[in-house]
Amino acid sequence: DRSPSRGLGDVYKRQVYIIETKHEKDTNALETVRTLFANKTRDFITAVDEKSIILVKEVKGNESYDELDKTADVIIDMLSTEAMSAAHVAYGTIVNDIREVSRSYKEAKMALDVGKIFYSNKNVVAYNRLGIGRLIYQLPIPLCQMFIKEIFEGKAPDDFDDETLSTINKFFENSLNVSETSRQLYIHRNTLVYRLDKLQKSTGLDLRVFDDAITFKIALMVVKYMKYMESKDTF
């Protein structure tokens, strides 16, 4: 019976990674991770459920979060090549005390969830870099519903057609730059202006105005969060 606290002295900094594999009961993945850290006697690795592996890793005094990112990248690369397994890795903050390891684990778990909702294109998600996604994740659902109702007066942002949504997302990606957005969408500048005007008429929000853009961006994230929570409740 190996528990995370056994054999882990109190003088080392640590931090928790959660590695979630695409397939359930992926024994190859667990073995690959164990092999990767085989010579690290102070690191602890275990499978917690069908798809998740936990790595409690010793952190050297001078190791930065950038280096922890690199470790996560190495894990993903190894799983991809050695175990033929796609994975997501999330990690918590560095803790100074063995009693705080559970906090780093909870942070990693939250990072995994927040990553699925808002940053699905990222394979590595760090708790301390979750940004606004972490804030939204901690909002009560009734508050989210009220916010969406107030902003859109009954018309949810995901009711927009694909063309409108891709225009909005591209506009945000390009920091509200009309010329660059129209170039990347292969449309005339006037076409983009027309779409933004149309959106303004239907929502009352002008995405060319910074405050309105922020409101809209947050609203889209809130809707993503609500949908994710809904899908969790249906299982």
What are these regions (language model features)?
Residues D10-F235:
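Cytosolic nucleotide-utilizing catalytic cores of signal-transduction proteins
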Residues D1-Y12:
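Single conserved hydrophobic/aromatic residue that forms the stacking wall/gate
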